[in-house]
């Protein structure tokens, strides 16, 4: 089934609050993650690093301005419902879960 539909599994799972994130650019292939600076921590950060992203450790209050200035390319926080209240969608319009 997987080969027939060109599907490739990526081992991961629900890691708490770091489950998805807001991205300044659209991600179409795993290659798009190469060198991408993302505010993400813990095991999710380790997974993203294996995919080529560069995990960044910045305080929650600095996420919006860092996305706005382009200091980081992507960020995770709580989840889309709460994150939209903080306006992340205005500076990073692509959300992936």
Indicate residue ranges for each PLM-predicted region.
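N-terminal secretory/targeting leader peptides
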Residues: 2-97
């Amino acid at each position: 089934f997987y080969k027939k539909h060109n599907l490739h599994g990526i081992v991961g799972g629900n890691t708490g609050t770091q489950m998805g994130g807001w991205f300044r650019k659209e991600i179409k292939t795993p290659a798009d993650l190469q060198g991408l600076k993302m505010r993400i921590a813990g095991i999710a950060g380790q997974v993203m690093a294996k995919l080529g992203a560069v995990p960044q450790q910045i305080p929650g209050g600095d996420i919006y301005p860092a996305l706005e200035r382009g200091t980081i390319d992507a960020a995770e926080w709580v989840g889309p419902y709460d994150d939209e209240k903080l306006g992340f969608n205005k500076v990073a319009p692509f959300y992936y879960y």
